Every structure is written in structure tokens, then in C-alpha cells.
């Protein structure tokens, strides 16, 4: 049965009303043809079947009509490990495009092979489905009999619900009352009207984060592509058109292919789903905060990175989305493809954006599949994309950062503060308890109260929500990467620069002790300061460590670990035959050096590297090892080969 892109369109329509005739026919066919052995399973064999989520069980038991659900396969690619293996096999590091291409081919190959038996069965029985490769799963529309049959396939790990949910971030949105058109927005509390800006007034969020000072250095996001996964975008908005990657200013025409994708197909808000549109205004607002320039309308620059380009994907329908629709946009961002194309064969990973903004939430309490979306975000991160996520609008209670994707370690989660730097009451707090991790979230806070930006019909308005804080950060990263291109694709170190340069705020909310500390579950590491981040990135350091034994003989293959005592970031390397180990890129802070392992561990604490300081040198000894270190400013060119020595952060 046809799966691209018709199923997406049929699914969208059926979610809002009755089943289309073609799906009714498919359902009847599925019931009338004989099922394979996988479906002929007796009740006593239940233990041998793949797991099924309680939410999906309830949906299937509620009636005989087909529902949308996810078939998650057992064979899943560890994207990070796959790329490490590819670099090892190549005997050299891969650049960003090569890494993205290698990952795309690995994911699609594995998914095609393992999905083949299921897809053949689904085709034979006329069952509508949509396969994915970014996580190895298939979205299926079927009834209880279809679900039971699929549970019997050896390739299947579990079945999960794919509920149609109203985004928690758009639901919590607050707007000012002076919007000029009659366009109906998502429901939200009305806020006090914001006064209209003049050409001399920048939005406070840009000023507070010191973006203009970065522009003065010549860095405006040039060469960087940011992405919006949201309710859509008015691409030809006066403030956004020039920064749209699909707009050719010389030819005065647009090419939307590879620059826009509408998951909802024929339920697009335009007659042609290949043309960007926005059915709520939320997405247009967030893109404006990333790249908008309203000077042509007699206003000011409204975006953090007016020199960056943007692309978009509509993952929500009237503010409603599903785990599958969210995953589909991530898949487009990993390797963009045409609206009518096949993501498995038509993807172009070389056109993938650098940074992906996500101002939406997917509640597990309503059936959102935590594990699948976690793997999706981890894969995007492994590809070198920064996944920025709004923390949520469920504050001020503790442990309210509880929804995908902001709850994940692989996402960079952002809370909201006002023009005075005070945390917004609605901003969700950590720690993350939904998965039992106790993970510190959010990482940072950014402006998110009465944020002035673009909205549909060439208008402007002020919104409040962590949805507004997240694009401030996504735009800030575009500035950072345009200033320090050696960080492009290195998500770990990019996050380190952002959190280490943030303005710390002492707070005791959601902590076991009443003593205010930083970082904390309210503000994270503090308030976003992109000028300080760029300053830090432009003054990198390097460390060289020499390890000898008690008789001064160089020691080979000895573990050397440098730990940032503020963030817990861990650099791991080992000595060569000359006893030397090098950590090529780090930033000022306080570190702990650890030599060896287990009972033979030599620890040197309190190594302080300060901005503008002279090289830091020291030694340490114990009964087995002698270690001498030197940490100094880097003034040479950052070579891509250094990535071989850059470890990943140890994340809780």
C-alpha cells in the first residue's frame, strides 16, 4: 500500500474526523484476508509477544475502529557508536557532512533490512503505515487484530501509542492583546498589551543577552542554518523572508524543496503542502526570535542571529501533534527531502540544519512514547545538531520539566526569565523525575516574558512562555558558531561554553537544602549571555600532561581525565609512548586531574584556569605515578583532527 506521502495526509484527516474511504477499504481488507502465523497466536502464548503500552491497549479495547500506533523494532542503531566506528575504519575524523552522510546511510540501511518482513506483511494486507529510520519504527493504522499480529513478529520489540495531543508549550502560551488581525490563535491567557517598538528599540531579550555586542564583533549568525519544528512559518513575512534559505534574493523567487516540510500533508494550511504556512502563529513568532529583521517595517531587528538562515517543518496541526509527527520532522532535519519524496532514498544530509529549535512538549501521561523520542534526539545530537528545547510552562512546582523532549539529557533545555532577569512563574523547574534520573534541568534560562516578534499576516506581537526562551538560545548558538566555527557540530563543547559563560543566579528552589546555590533546578546554570559565551569561545585553552613512573620513565597508555568541577564535563584521553597526553580544547574554569584508574588513581584537585591568566603549571605524585601538567592559551588554528581526542561529557 502507498506510504509516502499519502499516509500522512490520510492520517491527518482521519484524526480530525471519520476514516476516509481508502482507509476503510484497507481496514476491511485486513479483516477479510487470512492472517499469517504471527496473527494465529493463542492466548496462552501472550508471554512470547512483543510488549504493548497500556495507553495503546486502552485505545484498542475502546472500539473496533483502527487507531494509529507505533511498532518499535528491536534492532536500533546506536548513532554515536556507529559514527565512532566509521571514523576508526577511515583512520581519520569525518567532517560534518561526511558524518551526516555516513549516519544517514547506516540508519536507512539497517531500518530497511529489519523492517522488510513487517512491511511486506503490511503491504499484503492493505494496512496503512509510515516507516521511520531515525528511530527504527513503523507508524501503523490498524485495529486490535493488526496489533496482535504485529506483536508476534520476532523483529518487534514493543508497540506504543501514537496519541494526538495538544502541545503543552503552545497550550501554555500567553499573548498580548494588541494583535491586529482576526486570525484565531491557540488558546492562552491574555496578557497586558505591549507598546509598539520604534526603530531605535531592540527587543529586551536581544539586549539582555548582549547579542548586539556580538554583532559589533562582526558575527551575526552567517553561515549557520537554524531550524523550526513548530506550527509552521509564514515564510514571506517581511521580517523573515530575507533569512529563509529557500529565498533567492537575486532571482527574487523561492525554492521550498529541502527547506520546508509539512508532516500533515494535504491538511496543510495552504493549497500546496510544499509551501510553508502557519496555522497558529506560534512558529512564525519563534523563527522571528531566531533570525527576524523588522527594519523594513520601520521597527528593529527582532532576531538574535539576523545573519543566519532558517528552514522549517510543520510538526503540529492546529497546535496538535503526535510522537510520529514530531519524529517525522526530526527525520526531515537529519536529511531534508522533498514533500513528495521518500525519506529513505531522497534525503540530502548535506542540507541538514545546524541547530533545531523545539518549542513544544509531548506528555507521557497522555501516551507519549518516551524511549522513541529520546532515541530520536540522541541521533540528532550524534549528527552534530544542537537540539534546543523549551523547558515547559508548568511552573512554579518542582520537577515539572517532565515531558519529552526537554527532559532528555541530549536536549539543551531552556527556562524563561523576564526583563529583570527574574524567573517566570510559569517556567518549569527541575530536577527530572519522570525517568528517575534526577537530572538537572533546565540548563539555562533566557528571555521568555512579553517577547516581541513576528506573527502571521506581516504583524508583530508579544508572547510569553518558555517557547519564547528557547529560540533566543537557538539564535545565540548561531552567533556562537559563526564566531567560533571550530565548535560547529561539537555539541558537548558548545553546551559547555554556554553554561560556563552564563550569569549564575543563586537559588534554593527544588533543592533538599535551603542554601541558595548555582547551578540549581530553577535557573539551571544561570542567564544566557551570548557575548560572554563568544568571548570564552574565542579564548580557548589546551592542556598537556606528562606521566612518568617513580623512576621518571614515560608511561604509555595511562588514562588521563580532566574534570570540570562546575559542570562535571569530563575530558578523557591517554598517554602516548612518550608519556604525553593532550587535551586540545577547553575553557577557563576549575578542574580536577586524574591519572590512572581504580586503586592506582592519582588525583590533583583545584587546578584553576582564569580568563587572561598566564599558563597554569603544576605537578602531582604518589607511590606509582608522577604527573606534570601545563594548561595554556591556544593561539594556533583549530584542526579538525583534534576531534579524535575530544571526549563526550559524562551526563547523568
Regions found by a protein language model. Name each.
Residues 42-43, 102, 153-225, 238-241, ...:
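Protease zymogen maturation seam
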Residues 42-43, 60-66, 82-83, 158, ...:
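Subtilisin-like serine protease catalytic core
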Residues 564-585:
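Short, acidic Ser/Thr/Gly-rich low-complexity loop/linker segments typical of extracellular
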Amino acid at each position: 500500500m502507498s506510504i509516502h506521502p499519502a499516509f500522512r495526509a490520510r492520517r491527518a484527516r482521519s484524526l480530525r474526523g471519520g476514516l476516509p474511504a481508502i482507509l476503510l477499504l484497507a481496514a476491511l481488507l485486513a479483516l477479510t484476508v487470512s492472517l499469517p502465523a504471527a496473527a494465529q497466536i493463542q492466548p496462552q502464548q501472550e508471554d512470547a509477544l512483543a510488549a504493548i503500552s497500556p495507553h495503546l491497549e486502552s485505545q484498542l479495547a475502546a472500539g473496533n475502529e483502527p487507531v494509529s500506533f507505533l511498532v518499535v523494532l528491536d534492532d536500533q542503531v546506536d548513532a554515536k557508536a556507529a559514527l565512532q566506528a566509521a571514523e576508526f575504519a577511515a583512520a581519520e575524523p569525518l567532517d560534518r557532512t561526511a558524518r551526516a552522510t555516513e549516519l544517514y546511510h547506516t540508519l536507512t540501511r539497517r531500518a530497511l533490512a529489519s523492517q522488510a518482513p513487517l512491511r511486506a506483511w503490511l503491504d499484503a494486507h492493505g494496512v496503512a503505515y509510515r516507516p521511520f529510520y531515525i528511530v527504527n519504527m513503523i507508524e501503523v493504522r490498524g485495529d486490535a487484530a493488526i496489533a496482535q499480529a504485529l506483536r508476534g513478529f520476532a523483529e518487534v520489540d514493543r508497540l506504543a501509542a501514537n496519541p494526538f495531543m495538544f502541545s503543552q508549550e503552545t497550550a501554555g502560551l500567553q499573548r498580548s492583546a494588541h494583535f491586529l488581525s482576526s486570525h484565531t490563535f491557540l488558546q492562552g491567557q491574555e496578557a497586558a498589551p505591549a507598546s509598539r517598538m520604534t526603530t531605535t528599540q531592540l527587543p529586551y531579550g536581544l539586549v539582555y543577552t548582549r547579542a548586539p555586542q556580538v554583532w559589533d564583533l562582526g558575527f551575526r549568525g552567517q553561515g549557520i542554518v537554524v531550524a523550526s519544528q513548530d506550527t509552521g512559518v509564514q515564510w514571506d513575512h517581511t521580517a523573515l523572508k530575507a533569512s529563509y534559505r529557500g529565498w533567492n534574493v537575486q532571482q527574487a523567487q523561492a525554492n521550498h524543496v529541502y527547506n520546508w516540510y509539512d508532516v500533515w500533508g494535504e491538511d496543510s494550511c495552504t493549497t500546496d503542502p510544499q509551501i510553508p504556512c502557519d496555522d497558529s502563529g506560534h512558529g512564525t513568532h519563534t523563527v522571528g526570535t531566531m533570525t527576524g529583521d523588522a527594519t523594513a517595517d520601520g521597527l528593529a531587528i527582532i532576531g538574535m542571529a539576523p545573519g543566519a538562515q532558517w528552514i522549517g517543518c510543520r510538526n503540529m496541526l492546529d497546535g496538535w501533534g503526535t510522537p510520529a509527527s514530531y519524529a517525522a520532522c526530526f527525520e526531515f532535519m537529519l536529511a531534508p527531502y522533498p514533500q513528495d519524496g521518500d525519506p529513505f532514498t531522497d534525503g540530502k544530509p548535506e542540507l541538514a540544519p545546524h541547530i533545531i529549535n523545539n518549542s513544544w512538549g509531548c506528555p507521557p501521561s497522555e501516551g507519549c512514547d518516551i524511549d522513541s523520542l529520546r532515541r530520536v534526539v540522541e541521533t540528532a545530537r550524534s549528527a552534530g545538531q544542537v537540539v534546543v528545547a523549551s523547558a515547559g510552562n508548568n511552573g512554579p512546582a518542582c520537577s515539572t520539566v517532565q515531558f519529552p523532549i526537554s527532559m532528555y539529557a541530549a536536549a539543551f533545555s531552556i527556562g524563561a526569565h523576564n526583563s529583570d532577569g527574574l524567573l517566570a512563574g510559569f517556567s518549569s523547574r527541575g530536577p527530572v523525575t519522570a525517568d528517575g534520573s534526577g537530572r538537572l534541568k533546565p540548563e539555562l534560562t533566557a528571555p521568555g516574558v512579553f517577547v516581541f516578534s513576528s506573527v502571521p499576516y506581516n504583524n508583530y506581537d508579544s508572547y510569553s512562555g518558555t517557547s519564547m526562551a528557547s529560540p533566543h538560545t537557538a539564535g545565540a548558538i548561531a552567533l556562537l558558531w559563526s564566531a567560533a566555527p571550530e565548535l560547529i557540530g561539537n555539541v558537548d563543547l558548545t553546551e559547555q561554553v554556554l553554561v560556563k559563560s552564563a550569569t549564575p543566579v543563586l537559588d534554593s528552589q527544588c533543592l533538599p537544602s535551603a542554601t541558595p546555590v548555582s547551578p540549581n533546578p530553577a535557573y539551571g546554570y544561570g542567564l544566557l549571555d551570548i557575548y560572554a559565551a563568544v568571548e570564552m569561545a574565542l579564548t580557548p585553552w589546551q592542556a598537556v600532561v606528562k606521566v612518568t613512573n617513580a623512576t621518571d620513565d614515560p608511561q604509555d597508555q595511562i588514562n588521563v581525565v580532566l574534570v570540570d568541577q562546575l559542570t562535571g564535563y569530563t575530558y578523557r584521553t591517554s598517554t602516548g609512548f612518550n608519556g604525553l597526553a593532550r587535551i586540545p580544547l577547553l575553557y577557563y574554569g576549575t578542574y580536577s586531574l586524574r591519572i590512572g584508574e581504580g586503586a592506582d588513581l592519582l588525583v590533583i584537585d583545584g587546578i584553576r584556569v582564569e580568563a587572561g591568566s598566564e599558563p597554569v603549571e603544576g605537578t602531582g605524585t604518589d607511590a606509582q605515578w608522577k604527573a606534570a601538567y601545563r594548561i595554556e592559551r591556544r593561539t594556533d588554528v583549530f584542526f579538525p583532527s583534534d576531534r579524535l581526542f575530544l571526549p563526550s561529557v559524562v551526563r547523568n
